[in-house]
UniProtKB/Swiss-Prot annotation:
Gene Ontology MF annotations: RNA binding
Gene field: smpB
Keyword Cell division: no
Intracellular or extracellular location(s): Cytoplasm
GO biological process terms held by the UniProt record: trans-translation
Pfam families on file: SmpB (PF01668)
InterPro entries: SmpB, SsrA-bd_prot, SsrA-bd_prot_CS
Entry GO CC: cytosol
Name of the molecule in the record: SsrA-binding protein
Family note: Belongs to the SmpB family.
HAMAP family per record: SmpB (MF_00023)
Keywords: Cytoplasm, RNA-binding
Entry-linked CDD domains: SmpB (cd09294)
């Protein structure tokens, strides 16, 4: 079950490989995420010291959060992957033009997982081409739907 999607990711990047990772979270973060108080829009994934981290994910603390801790809404969160996957990702990210983009948060066996992808940034003309292609598909579906209704009525 998906918690939140980063819809802007597919608009801004060509998605090549998808990965799923666990995250190191604190208790108050898990409660807030389960309550839907999370945003992925400005977040990104980086490689630092041979490990992979998620930066910029905003988790708004619940008003009932404990008073003895100071929740940091945008703290850096470590992603949990196998060493082989990390090595493979580091090799790909070091190539020119590749980046790691968070796609969505979801539950898997009661745990919160992050789907992220290896992607290349789209240029403005690529975004226009994608939009044009979507419009064409939508128009084609509309015409076919309308055409089949007319044919059924005539029969």
């Amino acid at each position: 079950m998906s918690i939140i999607d980063n819809r802007k990711a597919t608009h801004d990047y060509f998605i090549e490989d998808r990965y799923e990772a666990g995250m190191v979270l604190e208790g108050w973060e898990v409660k807030a995420i389960r309550d839907g108080r999370v945003h992925l829009k400005e977040s990104y994934v980086i490689v630092r010291d041979g490990e992979i981290y998620l930066l910029g994910m905003h988790v708004s603390p619940l008003p009932t959060a404990s008073t003895h801790i100071r929740p940091d809404a945008t703290r850096t969160r470590k992603l949990l992957l196998k060493a082989e996957e990390i090595r493979k990702l580091i090799g790909k990210v070091e190539q020119r033009g590749y980046t790691l983009v968070p796609l969505n948060l979801h539950y898997k066996n009661g745990r919160i997982k992050l789907d992220f992808a290896l992607g290349r940034g789209k240029k403005l003309y690529d975004k226009r081409d994608t939009a044009r292609e979507k419009d064409w598909q939508r128009e084609k579906e509309r015409v076919l739907k309308h055409d089949t209704r007319v044919n059924q009525r005539d029969s």
